Amino acid sequence: MKDSHQTIGVFVRPTHYQNPLFEKLERAKEWVLKLLEDEGFESFMIDGLDGAKDERLIEKAYAFLCLGGDGTILGALRMTHSYNKPCFGVRIGNLGFLSAVELNGLKGFLQDLKQDKIKLEEHLALEGRIGKTSFYAINEIVIAKKKALGVLDIQAYVGHTPFNTYKGDGLIIATPLGSTAYNLSAHGPIVHALSQSYILTPLCDFSLTQRPLVLGAEFCLNFCAHEDALVVIDGQATYDLKANQPLYIQKSPTTTKLLQKNSRDYFKVLKEKLLWGESPSKKR
């Protein structure tokens, strides 16, 4: 095992004691920390994804273990994005598209990690800017209306060239990694997670001619809404977008880094998670 692999940070999302997963997470935290020690790793715990962090600890870590579901992984990836550190998910919860292993497979994963038998996947991330405020998104950036009623007009530009006006509930700008998240629920296309592209998917557009659009990641995009709107990052953070204020989006110079088992197959994951090829009775 390389010395640089010896320290693992552990992310756990705070869970209310009335949440059905609370006791399971509490037991899992203790078990994971003990397992890391038994396998020869140093570790430290980060409870919460609210931005409070010890930069020295994050710099010290080789990677971050995210205990929970995809939401925990997304929060951890955004927090550590500028540090260029990989994360891996240990699933406790539901779907888990991003997770590397189940809890009962963690020991084998750590043993493979010590022997450098784990693959590093690098995915496109988004960098957004509103005024002087910059942020990263792992799955998607959503421009959403603030009011329950009415239509939100969004003017879209490639560089400085206008190319479309969306009129509806909003617009999703997704990464390939995020194409199986909110984008998929909004009837956007699934794009291979390692592709270099953006997916623009309108939300309940007024025009029946509007369809999702896939653009190469070499483009810089910007958007303006005709009235105040919300910008939602990975379903976890929000920013205000004033009327006619530009939102700039481009490919982040730093990739999203996920550690996965060598045996992981993207198409097999899609088949299992989306129940492709299953009979209707099994899907229920």
UniProtKB/Swiss-Prot annotation:
UniProt cross-references to Gene3D superfamilies, sorted A to Z: Probable inorganic polyphosphate/atp-NAD kinase, domain 1, Probable inorganic polyphosphate/atp-NAD kinase, domain 2
Species of provenance: Helicobacter pylori (strain Shi470)
Protein name in UniProt: NAD kinase
Residues annotated to bind NAD(+): 70-71, 139-140, 167, 169, 177, 180-185, 236
Function comment: Involved in the regulation of the intracellular balance of NAD and NADP, and is a key enzyme in the biosynthesis of NADP. Catalyzes specifically the phosphorylation on 2'-hydroxyl of the adenosine moiety of NAD to yield NADP.
EC class: transferase
Location(s), subcellular: Cytoplasm
Pfam families linked: NAD_kinase (PF01513), NAD_kinase_C (PF20143)
GO biological process entries: NAD metabolic process; NADP biosynthetic process
Principal localisation: cytoplasm
